[in-house]
Amino acid sequence: LLYQVSTAGLAADHVAHPVRGVLNKKGIKFRMGSPISVDHKNKSIKLDSSETLDFDHLVVALGSATNDFGIPGVAEHGLGMKNVHEAIAIRAEIMRRFEDLCRFEDDTRLSIAVVGGGPTGVEMAGALAELKRGPLKNDLASAAEHIDIYLIEAGPRILPMFSEKLSARAESDLHKLGVFVRTNTAVREIQSRKIILKEGEPIPAEVTVWAAGVKGEPTAGLLNLPIVGSRIDTDENLEVNHYPNIWAIGDINGSKNADGRFYPMVAPVAMQQGKWVAKQILRKAAGQPLQPFKYRDKGSMATIGRHKAVVEVGKFRMTGPLAWYAWLWLHLFYLLGGRNKIGTIADWTWNYLT
């Protein structure tokens, strides 16, 4: 839901929840800090707070970081969307640029580009279009009409993990919202106020949102564990290869599925792996053999705009208002904290009615 924070659809404190507040109820001690090193011989981990924690089992769940694929200018001119702070930064930049646009009475335009045609990029582009058609138009229609929104995807279609039919439907919905969708468009460099392509004319972009992909969190390199790609090398049981009692889950996990591919970096995988590792630790404690992890794919969904979404569960596919309501319900269900749920419902209701 971070993209809704960045487009002023949700308040930041409605999508974030204090970790300590959740864990205290389970009798779990929480420490905030970044790992500096792991002493594998003595089974201890040192944090940047100078605290050293001993362990019998270590579960590494560092998550992921924005992947710039070595493209020049992404770090300097692109805005990532991996946490609440980055989402707020995007919102502030868009609003600042819009206020600048309001001062002009000529044909000056504001171009906002989203790079990456996966679910994050598609949802971000759709939310920007809704922001333009709603709050910004109500604020100053003449300025809102001068906003251009681009969605740039290097591959042949957006939402490649969905069926071709649903990808086409999502692209059609974005077109109806006024988004310029550019597929088969690879980025060579991000510069100030424009995007340089490998082929074709540059795309103007006063604001560039980078949603082209993620990689394993680089902090994992400090743990002296085997790395494959950008992830921790992990066996089928989710245990780090050659390091008994050390586990890796979520985006940092480097185990592979039956097809020999890494598991997708999505929340359902992390949630299932977290529960699985808990069971594995209990199995070890009871002297039972470990069981290989098997991911249960429960489907994919993406929202494009109001009453516009796509859902795919196996061969079942759904689009339009029903898919949109299903998306709302599912995301509301997984939000932590009753206050967050109530606040999110209030934000969504207000946005829907206004």
Regions found by a protein language model. Give the residues of each.
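C-terminal, flexible cofactor-proximal segment of oxidoreductases
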Residues: 273, 278-354
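Short glycine-rich anion-binding loops that position phosphate/pyrophosphate groups of nucleotides
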Residues: 63-66, 125, 214-216
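N-terminal Rossmann-fold NAD(P) dinucleotide-binding loop
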Residues: 121
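FAD-binding core/adjacent interface of flavoenzyme oxidoreductases
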Residues: 27-113, 142, 209
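N-terminal Rossmann-like dinucleotide/flavin-binding domain of flavoprotein oxidoreductases
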Residues: 1-57, 162-180
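FAD-site-proximal beta/loop scaffold in flavoenzymes
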Residues: 76-103, 193-196, 202-272, 276-279
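A Rossmann-like FAD-binding core segment of flavoenzymes
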Residues: 30-37, 129-236, 240-242, 290
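Glycine-rich Rossmann-fold phosphate-binding loop(s) that bind the pyrophosphate
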Residues: 115-118, 155
